[in-house]
Amino acid sequence: MARSGRYKVPFRRRREGLTNYRKRRKLLLSKKPRLVVRKTNKHIIAQIVVAKPQGDVTIVGADTRILAKFGWRGDENNVAAAYLLGLVVGYKARARRVEEAILDIGLHRPAPGARVFAVLKGALDAGLKIPHGEEVLPDEDRIKGKHVAEYAEKLKEENPEAYKARFSRYLQRGLEPEKLPEHFEEVKKKIVEYYEKKLAKVAAQ
């Protein structure tokens, strides 16, 4: 309950933990498209959004379910999937002639190496120009899922039943988690080849 005349009731979306208006204002003042990254319990979502007088307009967007199109059989909410999603959305943005953006992670805590920054790394590798500090990006081994592969290999040796339970989704999809880095590279190659062809067609128009 307010006890002071200076007390201000926060905006509803701020109260509900949905919007940081101070951060949003800074993003809008940049006048650049925003790479908006959000997470759910199962998936990661990335969009290129521009602010218009009537409200935000999404130019391109996707979530990690799109990775199945390129044969992805890993989880849809890990660092590797986040990177591949950023790669896809970065290429999709460039196909729409968007060449630069600014990262918008909403209320996510900006922990170095986090999934939101894996999306950023993917978009950068697709050719988007986005201001960032190198220290926030996950390293190459983590992006490829090497830590997952090493943990899976160790667990398989020490506790096969726990291994089957922990990685049941991978195994149901026909992927041995120890081979995640190799699988990652295969899917990344498919994404790059697919969208480079699209960009070549756009450039020829």
Curated annotation (Swiss-Prot):
- S-S bonds: none
Q: Which GO terms describe its molecular function?
A: 5S rRNA binding; structural constituent of ribosome
The subunit structure is: Part of the 50S ribosomal subunit. Contacts the 5S and 23S rRNAs.
Q: Does the keyword Ribosomal protein apply?
A: yes
Q: What does this protein do?
A: This is one of the proteins that bind and probably mediate the attachment of the 5S RNA into the large ribosomal subunit, where it forms part of the central protuberance.
Which InterPro entries does this one have?
Answer: Rbsml_uL18_euk
Q: Its Gene Ontology biological processes?
A: ribosomal large subunit assembly; translation
* Source organism of this protein record: Pyrobaculum aerophilum (strain ATCC 51768 / DSM 7523 / JCM 9630 / CIP 104966 / NBRC 100827 / IM2)
CC annotations in GO: cytosolic large ribosomal subunit
**UniProt key word Cytoplasm:** no
User: Can you name this protein?
Assistant: Large ribosomal subunit protein uL18
| Keywords assigned | Ribonucleoprotein, Ribosomal protein, RNA-binding, rRNA-binding
State the similarity comment.
Belongs to the universal ribosomal protein uL18 family.
Top-rank taxon of the source lineage equals Archaea
